[in-house]
């Protein structure tokens, strides 16, 4: 991508018509690739000295987070600001939610202040879909319980593309369903409680990757086999086949009972360490959505080693969220204009 690319050269993809980003399961391969191409362009535009491009000046993004977040919340805020938009930061503690106000009423109150996007994270699956029905502004899912985390799935795929797939995927003639053809990606760890896993599973498969789901039987349902995914219960048996390992943390906060005898036993079977790295391909990519638990799903030598792209995932998160905000805003403006012309 030409580093001199300017904002007026950014073209809106005709395939994108969604005013909301709620999940990847219901997006097509072409729509997913459109977001990734836009993110790649915006990343280039905002690198180096030019940190901001005024594509969304005058608009406002509200972050309504009802669960803790470091990467996602700050990333959405930076994404909005780099495109010239303002942000509203909401925290459930100290708000009227503590007085009994409902989730939807809170969102409607924030919308009434004139916001253009609501970015929401909530422990209950489906809450972003509910808001999309209740609000007039754009809604982005920043994680709804164990259901999905679409921008995390997108940033993970963007990172893989930039490291493993040359530049052919940027060509409009590329077949979206074959972008990851021939590539094997393993998601390792707590699949049962991971919204990141679900977004990755749908997105990677739509773009042609072979996906392996690996983890303890208590955390990996055989339902995934019925849906056509490969399931494994021993990392040692698959690591040599993988082009990418995405290591998911154990989400103890979502579990009612411990799914294995001890953290030590889990690490012995599933942690990516130096010994397992020597069994892997020379160019394997090591990923993790964060936060990482050193010594549990990954050892420090691997997390900080040359195969790790964990911090690059964080960087790409800003690009993906810039693309998401821009695409949704334009799609809504186009839809509103069409509706006005018909009236």
Curated annotation (Swiss-Prot):
EC number(s) per UniProt?
Answer: 2.1.3.2
Which pathway features in its UniProt record?
A: Pyrimidine metabolism; UMP biosynthesis via de novo pathway; (S)-dihydroorotate from bicarbonate: step 2/3
EC top class named in words: transferase
PROSITE patterns to which the protein is assigned, alphabetical: CARBAMOYLTRANSFERASE
Q: Name one GO biological process term.
A: 'de novo' UMP biosynthetic process
Query: Which catalytic reaction applies to this protein?
Result: carbamoyl phosphate + L-aspartate = N-carbamoyl-L-aspartate + phosphate + H(+)
Binding sites annotated in the UniProt record for L-aspartate: 99, 195, 249
Which keywords does the record carry? Pyrimidine biosynthesis, Transferase
Q: What does this protein do?
A: Catalyzes the condensation of carbamoyl phosphate and aspartate to form carbamoyl aspartate and inorganic phosphate, the committed step in the de novo pyrimidine nucleotide biosynthesis pathway.
Please give the name of this protein. Aspartate carbamoyltransferase catalytic subunit
Native source species? Rhodopirellula baltica (strain DSM 10527 / NCIMB 13988 / SH1)
